[in-house]
Design a protein with these regions (language model features):
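Ferredoxin-type iron-sulfur electron-transfer modules and their immediate structural context
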Residues: 1-47
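Iron-sulfur cluster-binding cysteine motifs and their immediate structural context
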Residues: 28, 37-85
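Structural motif
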Residues: 30-31, 59, 166-169
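Short amphipathic alpha-helical segments and helix-helix/interface helices
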Residues: 39, 111, 177-181
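Flanking helices and flexible, charged tails adjoining ferredoxin-like Fe-S electron-transfer domains
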Residues: 68-150
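Generic secondary-structure signature for well-ordered alpha-helical cores
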Residues: 113-116, 129, 182, 186, ...
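Cofactor-cradling patches in redox/metallo enzymes
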Residues: 134-136, 144, 148-232
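A charged, well-structured terminal subsegment
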Residues: 223-247
Length: 247
């Protein structure tokens, strides 16, 4: 890292551009011939891709790239990591969309009033495989240094301003997740991190899940990815707090 950047930490996170190999925000293009798109829809393991109407749900997407392989005229993955949204429906992209919209009007005013300068989060792995959890841990390493913005993770929900949930929300963790969230003082935020947290991912239809937590609690930030890149996490949190804008 020191050899690549000239210093240990990335100096300006706003100027970060990921490699072309990184699969970030997809661009969809409509074609009259839907043969390839229909093939991609049939191939998608989570039902994230639809041919008619042409759309891709990032909240379900595993970013495996198979849709782009079989339907290159319809879908192309860019290296844009700015894919967080304050709403679940904001993760659904359509033909012609050039970015994932982040409407500041959908952010509760108390979030920016109370947490703009400092935010402590409690992470709950709700049946995750460890990949998203490792990426969240990486946000605080010497390279990304999320702590420079006054944002970090704490062990106790009593010390936290909000909860970050990863994993598909299994039944075994349902009660513990509720207890943890209730232990955080108001006002608080709720972040769903990773495709599994957003939709259940590959396990969406599993009987082992219990996603009823989302029936009574509305997330403030949805961060797709399988796993979610540290830059996606950082960009989403800073945009939620009003410390940067989605241009």
């Amino acid at each position: 890292v020191l050899r690549s950047h000239g210093q240990q930490a990335i100096e300006d996170l706003d100027a970060v551009e990921l490699t072309e190999e990184f699969r970030g925000r997809p661009e969809l293009t409509f074609t009259e011939d839907t043969t390839e798109a229909e093939r991609a829809e049939a191939l998608c393991p989570t039902g994230a891709f639809r041919a008619d109407p042409l759309e891709l749900d990032l909240g379900r997407c595993l970013f495996c790239g198979e849709c782009a392989r079989v339907a290159p005229r319809n879908v192309r993955f860019t290296n844009d990591y700015r894919i967080g949204s304050p709403t679940r429906e904001g993760l659904v992209l359509h033909a012609g969309d050039s970015r994932v919209e982040f409407d500041p009007k959908r952010v509760r005013p108390e979030i920016r009033r109370c947490f703009r300068q400092a935010l402590q989060l409690r992470e709950v792995s709700a049946g995750g495989d460890g990949s998203v959890e490792m990426e969240l841990n990486a946000t605080g390493n010497v390279n990304f240094d999320l702590g420079r913005y006054g944002i970090g993770f704490t062990a106790s929900p009593r010390h936290a301003d909000g909860v970050v949930v990863s994993g598909p929300l299994t039944a075994q963790i349902a009660e513990a997740l509720e207890i943890c969230y209730d232990a955080v003082a108001e006002p608080k935020i709720l972040v769903m991190c990773g495709t599994e947290a957003c939709s259940g991912g590959l396990f969406a239809e599993s009987r082992a899940l219990d996603r009823s937590f989302l029936d009574s609690h509305t997330p403030d930030l949805w961060l797709p990815g399988a796993p979610t890149h540290p830059m996606t996490c950082i960009d989403g949190l800073l945009t939620l707090l009003g410390r940067k804008n989605r241009l």
